[in-house]
Amino acid sequence: MEDINIVIAGSAGEGVQTVGDVLVETIAVHGYSVFAWQEFESRIRGGQNSYSIRISDKPVNAPRMKADILLALNEGACNKYEPLIKQDGILIAQKKTRERMIAIAFSEIAQRELGNRIYINTMVIGALVAAVGMELEVLNHVLTRKFAKKGDKVVSDNLVAAGKGYTLAREGCRGICPWLLPKLDTHYTPIAGKEALSTAAALAGCRFMAAYPMSPSTDIITILSQNEKELGVFTEQAEDEIAAVNMAIGASFAGARAMTATSGGGFALMVEAISLAGMTETPLVIILAQRPGPATGLPTRTAQGDLLFAINAGHGEFPKLVLAPADADDIFKKIMRAFNLADKYQIPVIVLTDQFLLDSIFSVQDINLSQLGPTYYLTDPFKIQDYKRYLVTDNGVSPRLYPGQATHLVTADSDEHDSHGHITEDLSGTVIRMVEKRLAKYRALKGEINPPEEADIEGADKILVGWGSSRNAILEGIELLREDDIRVGMIHFTELWPLPEYRFPESKQYWIVENNTTAQLGRLLRSEYGITIAGVINRYDGLPLTAGYIRRNFNG
């Protein structure tokens, strides 16, 4: 089947997210893959927001901009988003304004026939289910489950509202709606990036999170707080980002796997503490959820502008790990890897996400969570006679105990220290050994870094190179470019520092694809690998990369 792209648009407070969430669940229960992402302004009421839903019988995990169906809840939304409608697409709105559209007076009908305008959203969902040719019975099942705790009358009233919207849309669809989506036996689970990340952190053994709210990272601590009993992660909303990161370091020193989360501005405040974790060799995981900057920037939009900032965060020289998951599936793997390697090498780990990755809803199949489990590296205190917290070893990793674990004295200091953790200024010996010990951890860590993913490299003379959340858009962009007879492949990084030992294929032209203005990955690869960059495809308007954008802006 051809993918179907639905855009639901309206003002903040009109229920755009509610409509989208219920529709996503209905599509998944129907057996189809769904990808959804939201575009919204930085305000609680007003403005115009959208919720885009892409439906397919094949796995889809990337956005498309053009709409097969635009449902506009108000005139302003219609004016803003109508240009997105494909030539053969349709508009669903309250008033007739064009030929290919379904006009349904949702507000008037909800008030007159259902007794309350509150049922507008349920009517809208019913109309969309009808427009794409799905079964009303499946929607009724989803609504019954959603409203079950509110009583039989609420359930009944919403089923009536959904049926009304469904019937009216079916009548309006005649001759203009070509879609028919029968129920399939396949099973997809829709999950938002932030839900995947929160769940993955708990599975990785995280037991403490401190954070100060900053979009787009805020939902992580919200989800963990709301599910504290189920997930077992204690959360603390700190007074600021400096307190949050230091709480996480303290919890880790005390023996708990710990993390914090923030965006660019908050991360700037955390940088000194990252050096503290580097010097005290305390495991720490920081989620850096990127948004456009500088300063406050665009709090509800997406970007990849903090790559070099993350790699270079912290004064002095010490090992750190920087990861950037590509999608929901990869989030589970990278978060587990972040906590395990932070523990193994006793280092800070920065996980680069962004608004698009966290807020988007992905379809996943057959995630075997039982295969995901933490590996702990705390030392057995009963195997140690003379405990030296900073014992010099071949790979730089020293024994690590937490206070109270045994009778051994556990110390740490942000000053340069000796093997016992006591302050030293022995410049001729101890200081050099400690610096070289930390450097040895960097070399050992570098040996564990996975190479970038390669796709369609053979036979391609041009290679698109990206990182993090750009992966699926690049893969779809390759398909479109090959339709234009352009032989193109992909190299994609999700482990960004230390960079892996990797040899770029020769006789290729490399194009950097990033959600920033300065092609930061390109600058990094040029300095570390010496490759020549043939061109760049940058997007920096706050919207995510799409296959169509890549195709339009590739001029190789």
Language model segments and positions:
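Short, conserved loop/helix-junction motifs that constitute active-site signature segments
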Residues: 82-88, 278, 366, 504-507
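Short beta-strand segments
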Residues: 72, 92-94, 262, 285-289, ...
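Thiamine diphosphate
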Residues: 2-65, 69-78, 82, 208, ...
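Gly-rich Lys/Arg/Thr-decorated short loops/hinges at beta-loop-alpha junctions or inter-strand turns
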Residues: 147, 171-186, 201-206, 225-231, ...
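Flexible, low-complexity linker and terminal segments
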Residues: 190-194, 202, 339, 343-556
